Amino acid sequence: MEQVSHASSITPAQNASIPLEQQREDFKKNRFIAMPLAGTVVWALLGISAPFVSELTITWLLYIGTGAIFYLGAGLSYLTGERFFAKKAAKNSFDRLFFVGMIMSLMVFAIALPVAAIDHTTVPLSIGILAGLMWMPLSWAIEHWIGYFHTLTRTFGIVAAWYLFPDARVEAISAVIVAVYIVSLITLERRFQSIKSN
């Protein structure tokens, strides 16, 4: 979900002299929907396919699918206008902060993988929660409630689904994640349109 800044005429060397508050204001102007769109598509496909494949297959699909979210999001960013890898786009400190937050979330997989080796049914629980953690620093950076809502609702919803639907965990957890993504996408797009109109 790394975003590009609208201050495209600023070079990285010049960026160091821009006050953090100005960098934050530039960062807040981003749309932020490419990655959630990718996540929605992937988790919907995982939930739909789960009843028709073996437990081993869905476990692999969870790893592969969630790993593909970044690449799908990067591709979608060219359709949404976010253009993650545009050469003229200036990156700022908040882009880097979000990227570091994403790496931090991925490092927690060091806990999830050994646990999954003991009990593969924990994979949708752990991946679903870990992948949602990066919304917290985003919420702080853009000074908007949606990231906090996303992480908290997703986490509690996933835990509830994991306990309430032991025979359909992937389907239930996917449904929770997709529902939270839909709310997040609508909110982010409304936020972006509001910023654009001002």
Where are these predicted regions, by residue range?
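Short, Lys/Arg-rich, polar N-terminal cytosolic tail immediately upstream
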Residues: 1-28
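Selected alpha-helical membrane-embedding segments in polytopic membrane proteins
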Residues: 40-97, 103
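Small-residue-rich segments of transmembrane alpha-helices in multi-pass membrane proteins
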Residues: 41-43, 95-106, 153-165
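Helix-coil boundary and interhelical linker segments in multi-pass alpha-helical membrane proteins
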Residues: 47-61, 111-122, 162-171
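Structural signature of hydrophobic alpha-helical transmembrane segments
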Residues: 60-72, 113-129, 175
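Alpha-helical transmembrane segments and their membrane-interface exit regions
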Residues: 67-75, 129-138, 178-188
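Membrane-proximal helix-loop-helix units in multi-pass membrane proteins
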Residues: 108-156
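Terminal transmembrane helical module of multi-pass membrane proteins
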Residues: 147-198
